[in-house]
C-alpha cells in the first residue's frame, strides 16, 4: 500500500482536517491545527507531504521519525501539530486495514469507560452557575471554567476577590455534588498565581490548569509545594522531551498533552507512559473537533493513568460548527452518566461526512484569538 494524496480542509469554528488517500482506496483522517495558525500548519503538512507521497502508511513509527528527525530544526507547535494530524490519519488507515479500532492495536482496553468533563463559559457567577445547571441536566458532573480574567503581573485585591468570589458562589450553589477545574490559561504571573492559589484552596477545585505559562515551568514545583490543589499543565508542550523536564522537576499532578499539537497518538502514548512512571495522571487537552477527540479517547483507553477527558460539545469557541457536525456516526460519541465508551469501529472510529467538510471548507473563517490589553495599554496574556 502507498500514500497517493494528502488533502487539507480548514473548517469552522477553528479546526483543520486532513485526508490521506492510498492506492488501495483506504482513507485516513486526522486533525492537525494550531488555533489561530491553521494556514501555517497547513503549509507544514504539505511540506511533509512531499516525502509522504509514495510511502507505505503502515510504517507509522518510521514515518514519524522521518518527519521529526529528518530536518535539522524540529519540534515546536507548528511542526508537531502537522505531525500530529498526519499520525492520527496513519493510525486511522492501519485500523481500517486490520479491521480493528486503534485501541485494540495498542494492546487493548485498560478500562470500560472514561469520565468526560465539560467547559462552562460565562463572565459572571450567575452565568456560570446557570451553565452548570444545564449541563448537569444532560449528565455532566465535572466541569472546567476560567479561573480569572486578565491579571496584571502584580494586580490588586479587587481582581483577586473577583476570581475567588465566582468560585465561592459555585461551591455554595452545588456543594460537593460537582467537581470543577480552574483554568488560569497561563494569563497569571508567578507572583499572582501564588496569591490566587492560596485564596482558592478552601473551595477545593479539582485542579488548577496552567497556573503559569509553560515557559515558566520552573514554578510548577514551587507552586505545588504551597498547595493541596493538583496542578495540571501541558497543552502548550509539544514533545516528550518537553514533558521530560517537567516530570523530572515535579509539581505537576496531571499532564495535558494535546493529541493535535504534541505529535499525535504515537507521541502522546509515550508521554502517557512517562507520566505513569512518575505517578502523574493523564487528561488530554481537547477543545477541538471530533478527530482530535477520537484520538484522545484511544489513548485514554490504553493508558492506566488517564483520569478524565476534555471535550468541546457546546464550548463557547464553537461558532459556525459544533463538535459532531462533520460526523456521521454521532451515536458512537454518546455519553452515559458523563462517561465516554470506547469507539468500536475500525481505525479512529469516526465516520466523516466528507461532503459537508468540502462544503464548509469553502468559506472557512481565519480564527484568531482575541488581543487583550491592560488598562495602561500594554499587551495582556489571553
Swiss-Prot record:
Which InterPro entries does the record associate with it?
DgoD-like, Enolase-like_C_sf, Enolase-like_N, Enolase_C-like, Galactonate_deHydtase, Mandel_Rmase/mucon_lact_enz_CS, Mandelate_racemase_C, Mandelate_racemase_N_dom
Task: Please indicate which residues carry the site annotation Increases basicity of active site His.
Answer: 258
Q: What EC number(s) are associated with this protein in UniProt?
A: 4.2.1.6
Q: Which GO terms describe its biological process?
A: amino acid catabolic process; D-galactonate catabolic process
Look up the record and name the cofactor or cofactors this protein needs.
Mg(2+)
User: Pfam families, from UniProt?
Assistant: MR_MLE_C (PF13378), MR_MLE_N (PF02746)
What EC class does the entry list?
Answer: lyase
In the record's cofactor note, how is the cofactor described as bound?
Binds 1 Mg(2+) ion per subunit.
Q: Transmembrane segments in this chain: where?
A: none
Q: Which family does it belong to?
A: Belongs to the mandelate racemase/muconate lactonizing enzyme family. GalD subfamily.
Protein name, UniProt field: D-galactonate dehydratase
Amino acid at each position: 500500500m502507498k500514500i497517493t494524496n494528502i488533502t487539507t480542509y480548514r473548517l469552522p469554528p477553528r479546526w483543520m482536517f486532513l485526508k490521506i488517500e492510498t492506492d488501495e482506496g483506504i482513507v485516513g483522517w486526522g486533525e492537525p491545527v494550531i488555533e489561530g495558525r491553521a494556514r501555517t500548519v497547513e503549509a507544514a503538512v504539505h511540506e511533509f507531504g512531499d516525502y509522504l507521497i509514495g510511502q507505505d502508511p503502515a510504517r507509522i513509527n518510521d514515518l514519524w521519525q522521518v518527519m521529526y528527525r529528518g530536518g535539522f530544526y524540529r519540534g515546536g507547535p507548528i511542526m508537531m501539530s502537522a505531525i500530529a494530524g498526519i499520525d492520527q490519519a496513519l493510525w486511522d488507515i492501519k485500523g481500517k486495514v486490520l479491521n480493528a479500532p486503534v485501541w485494540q492495536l495498542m494492546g487493548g482496553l485498560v478500562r470500560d469507560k472514561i469520565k468526560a468533563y465539560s467547559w462552562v463559559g460565562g463572565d459572571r457567577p450567575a452565568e456560570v452557575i446557570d451553565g452548570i445547571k444545564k449541563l448537569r441536566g444532560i449528565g455532566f458532573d465535572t466541569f472546567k471554567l476560567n479561573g480569572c480574567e486578565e491579571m496584571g503581573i502584580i494586580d490588586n485585591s479587587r481582581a483577586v476577590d473577583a476570581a475567588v468570589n465566582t468560585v465561592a458562589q459555585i461551591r455554595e450553589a452545588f456543594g460537593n455534588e460537582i467537581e470543577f477545574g480552574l483554568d488560569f490559561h497561563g494569563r497569571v504571573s508567578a507572583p499572582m498565581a501564588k496569591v490566587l492559589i492560596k485564596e482558592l484552596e478552601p473551595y477545593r477545585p479539582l485542579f488548577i490548569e496552567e497556573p503559569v505559562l509553560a515557559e515558566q515551568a520552573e514554578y510548577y514545583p514551587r507552586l505545588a509545594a504551597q498547595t493541596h490543589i493538583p496542578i495540571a499543565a501541558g497543552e502548550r508542550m509539544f514533545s516528550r522531551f518537553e514533558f521530560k523536564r517537567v516530570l523530572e522537576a515535579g509539581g505537576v499532578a496531571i499532564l495535558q498533552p494535546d493529541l493535535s499539537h504534541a505529535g499525535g497518538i504515537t507521541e502522546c502514548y509515550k508521554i502517557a507512559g512517562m507520566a505513569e512512571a512518575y505517578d502523574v495522571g493523564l487528561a488530554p487537552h481537547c477543545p477541538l473537533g471530533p478527530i482530535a477527540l477520537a484520538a484522545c479517547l484511544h489513548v485514554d483507553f490504553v493508558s492506566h493513568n488517564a483520569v478524565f477527558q476534555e471535550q468541546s460539545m457546546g464550548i463557547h469557541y464553537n461558532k459556525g460548527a459544533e463538535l459532531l457536525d462533520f460526523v456521521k456516526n454521532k451515536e458512537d460519541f454518546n455519553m452515559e452518566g458523563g462517561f465516554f465508551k470506547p469507539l468500536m469501529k475500525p481505525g479512529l472510529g469516526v465516520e466523516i461526512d466528507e461532503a459537508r467538510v468540502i462544503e464548509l471548507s469553502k468559506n472557512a473563517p481565519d480564527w484568531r484569538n482575541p488581543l487583550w490589553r491592560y488598562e495602561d495599554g500594554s499587551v495582556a496574556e489571553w
